[in-house]
Amino acid sequence: MFENYRTFETTYAGRPVKVETGKTCGLANGSCWVRYGETVVMANVTASAKPREGVDFFPLSVDFEEKMYSVGKIPGSFTKREGKASDKAILASRCVDRPIRPLFPKDMRNDVTVVITVLSVEPDNSPEIAGMIAASIAISISDIPWNGPVASINVGYVDGQLVLNPTLEQRAHNDLNLTVAGSADKVVMIEAGANEIPDDLMLEAIKFGHAEIKNMVAFISDIQKQIGKPKFEFESMELDHDMMDKILDQFGDKLKYALDTDDKTVRDARLVPIQDEIVETFSEEYENLPDIIGEVMYKAQKTIVREWLYNGKRVDGRGIDEIRPLAAEVVVLPRVHCSGIFTRGQTQVMTITTLGPVSDAQKLDGIDEETSKRYMHQYNFPSYSVGETKPSRGPGRREIGHGALAERALVPVIPSVEEFPYAIRCVSEVLSSNGSTSQGSICGSTLSLMDAGVPIKAPVAGISCGLITKEDGSWMTMVDIQGLEDFYGDMDFKVGGTKNGITAIQVDIKVDGLTYDIIASAFEKTHKARNYILDEVMLKAIPEVRPTVSKWAPKMLTTKVPVDKIREVIGSGGKVIQKISAECDVKIDINEDGNVFVSGLDLAKAEQAISIINTIGNDPEIGAIYRGKVTRLMNFGAFVEIAPGKEGLVHISKLDKQRVNKVEDVVTVGDEIVVKVMEIDDQGRINLSRRDALADIEAKKNAE
């Protein structure tokens, strides 16, 4: 029945890989299963028979489907179905899309869809890496034109050694999470988060990963030779070369004048009448020109701008390694916890940081081992930031990707929960965009976090590097690309980091790959630019982290109780902890390990709650002073509750410094008084003294 069923086996990073084709999904253009250890993914690729009408781009979509059954979970949603793609799945889709997209024919407009379905997950073997391999195989053996194959790999840095596809245990103490995708001779995608890794070590890690990628690419190429289908002929949508030559000859000077300004608004205004004039001049000769004028204008501008850049001219007059004018500001909003605005040319980003209790950490319901994250970064890109009108539909893949990059850049410098027991949310609002908004988000977030009093280990800045290549193989790179240079260039090499090293990388390319020399040049230029931004702008706006959090932020205190005392702190049905929360106006979170987090706007009340919790969680100490509540009066003394469930007796002789005839003369039920623990007998009964507590407090005041 399955006469086309084939299997192929190899090893990758020392672990077995098995590829199966010809058994399932027979109607897709290309399909395969990849088993990487016990991680199993299925990839299917399909293409439309005809090109899509009215588009000037290649319509590729990539979906990475996380199935909860792959990790033995039932979805937590009301419907118990997988819902919209998680952020992690979207990021995985982007990590497949970016390497494969530049390898499709530039003039093809047929819809192509790649669907990667995660069927089984072994934590040691990444489904994202297996998914990239599966997608590459599915496209390679299909009849869809493509200049692959490619593969990807994860590189870690564990205990001073570079590691390929680190295991779950190794990832727990890993200083580098680098994903590299490559072809047989070039690097086509880089995505990284790192603990301040030096440039030279990062380049070494890329080369280390690429060496193993070459083996997988050779394996996929061999599969393609054995079972690959002939590639179909497609209708080329390439623009008429003669038409483009005529337009550039007649309107080249006007286009150059329109483009030669550092003001995006002025440039756009200048281009509108030129576009209308081109249509009016050539529409009789080329009847379809009104339908393709957008693509014509794109290609004409691209030709001019690329030639300028290669020869060292930038539209805003900057040098190749010159950064746009910069500005940084903090405390821009009065009642938020903290805020910062970072401006680079016509790109402006405002980041607001909000601090909350640790329980506000984001809960993650996915196939990953991670269940929550305490530091969250979200990026918003409204249409007004580029002067357009468009309805707000919530964050798209681009916004999620940019937010994740800024988050990765800051995570290595965020203090541990023990050092700073808060959940932290940064929101970057793009106010104006002319390129490199994600890097502006990194800078704005650093300003905001420092303003918030978050003791980050080092300030982080972000910068991008662009690329122009020629057909003869020559190339040049430029730092701090603006929108036009990103749009018409070949690369957006985004790097975030401190003065000590790199914390995040994201590389998008439009060519068939990067050489090591190009990557080294990008590292060198971004490193210098990062240091300049930090020294000359950001650290002048806020030289060091605020010593305290904002008065509007909750005050957070921590303590730890023995695990066997957690039940007492919580109380039956939560009565004890609810009572403490209500009386002290605080929020209390208790972890399974006994760590307790108390948050509230009033520091004194938070300290009171901590004192009560410590009293419950730890046996009363002889000689310690507590504040308790009088619960009962007897002829011989008063019973005082120093913590929920812990009561002691203040004998009438120890109620006051003077002789007391009646207990009621000194205290009544409900009074709060200070008491000192004098004795705990064999039966656990606590003897207290108000007289000694008052004497100790008075002696301490006199000593001060």
Q: Which residues make up each language-model segment?
A:
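Extended amphipathic alpha-helical scaffolds
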Residues: 1-48, 235-369, 554-568, 576, ...
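Glycine-rich, flexible beta-strand/loop modules in the N-terminal catalytic cores of phosphate-handling
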Residues: 28-112, 118-125, 184, 191, ...
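Flexible glycine-/small-residue-rich
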Residues: 36, 45-47, 64-66, 116-120, ...
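Single-stranded RNA-binding regions, centering on S1/OB-family and related RNA-binding modules
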Residues: 552-558, 563-704
